[in-house]
Design a protein with these regions (language model features):
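Conserved N-terminal beta1-alpha1 strand-loop-helix module at the mouth
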Residues: 1-49
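Active-site pocket-lining/capping segments in soluble small-molecule metabolic enzymes
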Residues: 126, 139-186, 193, 224, ...
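Active-site mouth loops of central-metabolism enzymes
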Residues: 15-33, 91-104, 174-192, 268-282
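Flexible, glycine-rich active-site loops centered on histidine and acidic residues
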Residues: 103-150
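Glycine-rich, proline-tolerant flexible connector loops at the mouths of alpha/beta enzymes
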Residues: 42-75, 126-140, 205-221, 304-306
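Conserved, mostly hydrophobic/aromatic
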Residues: 19, 47, 113, 200, ...
Length: 318
């Protein structure tokens, strides 16, 4: 089923979903299963699987020189999606990126998704590489998420990039996109950012999942302004529990989000990461309860490869 069909079938009941990241090369997929297993009791209708873009590494050539190589540290997104779909009988949502992929490579991945019965995808621009000042698309790739959405929507209409053919089995992808309650870090204003979101929806996006936030008022204001701009698709809140002290620094730095003073003060009073983790769980529980009471369609959790805190939260909310 499509994500939007799951939402419609729930008839106003808030659903539970979460996002996982592929293991690094050389690690076992069993690690993923071990993190997914405790969360299945909450009956997620779908699970997101991230995609990592290529990055540069330096390999010792053995003569005092280093070779700069392009590699992907966490491949396997589509294989993991197929494996989870088969093992747990749950829909999966692979993330598709503009960065690091040509339009042709994107089309081939979409064809694979279609053959595997995967009919939900998340369309994202992706981040700049570590040695780039700003995002640079791969030659022949999509520049923006709206362009990627348009390409997927073209395939839904039976139109391939270069081939003219009779299509008797069209794809029918449900397309998710990202929304930013505190605006994208590159956007000059929230209004400008909402215009970009409207472009993605107009290009064919079916639902929105927000970046993490820690103040529900910002989500509610974001939804209000999105509706005023004519964005009518479901807007799913994304929740990330604080887990370690360094989150106070790196989350605002990386995602350009604000942390409430009450949360900062609570974390700073903690003596160790176990206490911080519990503060994060309790904060996310209160966020989730309020959002659920407001009738959000889905509560979507960013697990970052760890499920115990998500399980604790879900046990108090669902």
């Amino acid at each position: 089923m499509k994500v939007t069909e799951h939402i419609e079938a729930a008839k106003g009941k808030t659903l539970f979903s979460f996002e996982i990241i592929p293991p690094q090369k050389g690690k076992s997929i069993q690690e993923l299963y071990d993190n997914i297993d405790p969360l299945m009791e909450f009956k997620p209708p779908f699970i997101d699987v991230t995609t990592s873009r290529e990055e540069y590494i330096y390999v010792d050539k053995g003569n005092g020189l280093l070779d700069k190589k392009l590699t992907r540290m966490r491949p396997g997104t589509l294989g993991i999606c197929a494996s989870i779909k088969h093992k747990y009988q749950v829909d999966t949502v692979p993330h598709l990126l503009c960065g690091g992929f040509t339009k042709e490579e994107t089309e081939y991945m979409l064809v694979d998704c279609h053959y595997l019965g995967i009919n939900n995808v998340m369309a994202l621009r992706g981040d700049a590489m570590k040695d780039e000042q700003s995002f640079v698309p791969k030659a022949g790739g999509n520049n923006y998420a709206a362009d990627l959405v348009a390409q997927i929507n073209q395939l839904n209409n039976g139109k391939y990039l270069h081939d003219v053919m009779d299509v008797d089995n069209k794809a029918d992808f449900c397309i998710g996109v990202a929304g930013y309650p505190e605006k994208h870090l590159e956007s000059p204003s929230l209004t400008t950012d909402l215009k970009r979101l409207k472009e993605k929806v107009d290009a064919g996006a079916d639902y929105v999942v927000t970046q993490m936030f820690f103040d529900n008022a910002k989500y509610f204001e974001f939804v209000k302004k999105a509706r005023e701009m004519g964005i009518t698709v479901p807007i799913i809140p994304g929740i990330k529990p604080i887990a370690v002290q360094k989150h106070l620094q790196i989350l605002p730095q990386i995602f350009r989000i604000d942390l409430p003073e009450d949360l900062i003060n609570a974390v700073e009073k903690c003596k160790n990461n176990a206490e911080i983790r519990q503060v994060g769980v309790e904060w996310a529980i209160q966020q989730s309860i309020e959002l659920k009471a407001a009738g959000v369609p889905v509560l979507h959790y960013y697990s970052m490869g760890k499920s115990e805190n998500i399980r604790q939260i879900a046990s108090q909310v669902f």
